[in-house]
Structure formats: structure tokens, C-alpha cells
Amino acid sequence: MSIRCAFLFPGQGSQSLGMGQDFFNNSEVAKKMFIEASIQTGIDFSELLFEENPLLSQTEYTQPAILLVGAMAHKLFTDETGIKPVLTMGHSLGEFTALVAAGALDAVDAVKLVNLRGQLMAKACSKQEVGMMVSLGLSDDAVEKLCEEQREAGLQVWAVNYNADGQIVIAGIKKDLELFAPMVKEAGAKRAMLLDMSVASHCPLLESASAPLEAKLKEMLKDDFISPVISNVTAKAYDTKAEALDLLPQQLVKPVLYKHSMANIDDEVDCYIEFGHGNVLKGLNRKATKKPHFNVSDMASLEATIAAIKELDV
């Protein structure tokens, strides 16, 4: 197959009741992965995902659930097509699923790893009320300048996710974000709203989580990448265990350069395939690319994506 595919994986915020259930009900391969992940982590994923469960909003449960469904979707697609990506990329948590797709992490090991990542992040944020907010319609420079000015004034706020032009997520202490939101609107943002997040991702508040995450990564990462992975920290490709060990702990405390990553890779690919529930990244990519973007989130979208890729490759 000559078509160049980039495999994409979403992060936190893409979770939803019932995600992965269609795979579980209709694929023995998916069911086996699901059961093995439940045994290895001690998390009953069917109870977590297929029934109303408040735990799904807690990061130590959200992260393994999202990764599991994304890895499941990816496995079913690649088992049926044999397609290898020219590169893999994820948004925040999604970078770990991208490592699974690149062959550098076993899927169930990765579920365990991000369960730990969530626990470490929750612990790092447990002594103060933290949060995240999104700014829409303001430039990167304007948001960064505001953050810097307000940090000098004593607020703890950082620009942490560069998602798309005019869309930036800010993390910090919750009461500081509540003070900061009206300042962002006054500066010209169309919207500034707090997100339903229990942690403050990709900022210095997570410093204490980096070392223990790195220690676990050393145990689990493999050095046999089948494709490069795009780093959230640098917006550039890496394909060795040593690079991953350097970059992934940094990812906890440094911004996600998602829109920069898209700009860097768009000329190298013919289409994007997003694995996991929903199509969050398709929305972010609308302004960044004119290339086709497919999503694999259930059995119907799996078959539709396979058919569409065959059409593109004629």
C-alpha cells in the first residue's frame, strides 16, 4: 500500500459512557485485551465504561480507559489491514497510545503505565485545588504575555496546550484561573471557560510526578519502534527508547505543541486515522490540514475507514 497514513490518538476529554463497548461485544480480540487489562490493573473496565460511573472523570481511571479503547481500535484496524503508519502522534495522554502503535510499548503495559501516570498526577495536585481552562480567539503571543504578567503578579497560570490557531488551554491553581478568565476575555478572547479537569496538566505543578514516571518507563519501554512518534514537547519525531525516556517525563511539565506538530507533519502524510472514542482531533485539525481524516471508534467506523483507505489507494 503506497498511501502514507498518520495514526492519531486523543487525550483526556474524549472519554464517554459506553466507549469501547461495540468492540467488546463484537470482537474476541478486543474482549481478550479488555479482560487482560482489567486483570493486570485491578480496574473493572466493563463497570467503568459500560455503566454510569463517577470514577471515569478521575484521571487515574480516565487515562487507562482512553488508552485501552484507542489501542483496541488500532489493533483491530491493523490486524485487518496490515497497514503500518509513516508516523504516530497523540495529544497528551495520546502520545502513550502512539507509542503502542509504534511498537515501543505493549498495550496492556501501557494501560498500567498511564494508570500510574494518572495516580502520580493526582497526587501532585492533591494539596491544592487546580484546574484548566480554554481560551478561544486569542493569539498565542497574547495568552503567553498575559500568563507571564500574571505569574509576575503572583498567579500560578501557564499556557499548556497549543491545540489550534486561537485555541489554547491554560492550567494552574483553580482560584487563579477564575481570576484569570475575565482578563483573557478583556484582552479579546471570544470565550474563556474552565474545563472539568481534576489535574493541572503540562505545567510545573506536576514536577514531582516526573521521576517516578521515568522509572516505570525504563521498565516498560522497548527499543524496537516500527515508526517514529511525534513528541508533544518538541513537535518533532523520535524513534528510540533513550529519546522517549528523555521526552515523556518532560511532557508532564511542558506544553503540548499539537498545532506545531500538525504543521510539521502535514506534508509527510496523505491521510490521518484517529483511533479511539469520538473525533476530537478531527475538530482540532480542521484548520490545520485539508487531508482526509478518518476515525475508528466502533465496528461500523472501522469498516468504513478500511473501505475509504482502499478507495484512496487505488
Positions of predicted regions on the chain:
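Non-catalytic positions within long, well-ordered alpha-helices that form the structural scaffold/packing
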Residues: 78-81, 185, 266
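FabD-like malonyl-/acyl-CoA
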Residues: 2-143, 271-300, 304-305
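Short amphipathic alpha-helix with an adjacent loop that forms part of the alpha/beta core around
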Residues: 305-312
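Glycine-rich phosphate/pyrophosphate-binding beta-alpha loops
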Residues: 62-64, 200, 255, 259
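Short, solvent-exposed amphipathic alpha-helical segments in soluble enzyme
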Residues: 24-25, 149-150, 185-187, 286-290, ...
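Alpha/beta catalytic cores of group-transfer enzymes, especially the acyltransferase/condensing modules
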Residues: 12-14, 103-252
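A short, acidic, amphipathic alpha-helical segment used as a generic capping/interface helix at domain edges
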Residues: 253-270
